[in-house]
């Protein structure tokens, strides 16, 4: 059973951020869509310059999965230099909530797999909890760390100036606990990486920070929520008593 769970975990973790798609709450309000290109350029630049960030991707896929489980959400955060990172993917099915968790801290990769019963609480909630496993993290953080994740997202989105000739409708909404403006593009716009198209984005009304991007790709829609730019708490290693002791 453990071997099967490990294989499933590895398969799920292989989800590419290039498949990020789009869907978000549509709230009404008043705003002008005339400055969508300027709002996009400012927001994109802020994300490019952030030294840490949290990205939560909610996926809604209508495309064939070819036997691969598609998570309902993927939550990753950390500094863009790749020195550490936190990853949690969540799957909900048949009354169960499955979490695939990873942390990279001080050259060590910690991972575990948990299952909970939805709607239960207390001792009835956990269905399966494994200890964290610890292995040396030998991958190049520039290729697999948070910076690479941000670069992958940016590469799938229009570059600065990419919306200059695009019409958009704008709505004043509440998003992430603050006043915001959601721009809905009249036509989806692709970035340098073909196959992914931006359909809408939301920025903070106060400082123009990018709050969400909505994209579509090959039958997959999702919303990526960005937060904690430059303010991500340091990633901590799990408590020692929750880590599986290695033989020898």
Where are the regions a protein language model picked out?
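Short amphipathic beta-strand and strand-loop transition segments with alternating hydrophobic
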Residues: 162-175
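Acidic/charged, solvent-exposed loop-and-adjacent secondary-structure segments enriched in E/D, K/R, S/T
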Residues: 110-155
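Gly/Pro-enriched, hydrophobic low-complexity segments
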Residues: 177-241
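N-terminal leader/targeting segments and the immediate start of mature chains
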Residues: 2-81, 236, 240-248
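Generic short beta-strand segments
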Residues: 56-63, 90-92, 184-190
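Short, solvent-exposed aromatic-acidic interface loops
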Residues: 89-97, 215-221, 242-247
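Short, surface-exposed coil-to-beta transition loops
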Residues: 68-74, 95-101, 193-199, 219-223
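N-terminal beta-strand/beta-hairpin edge segment
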Residues: 70-115
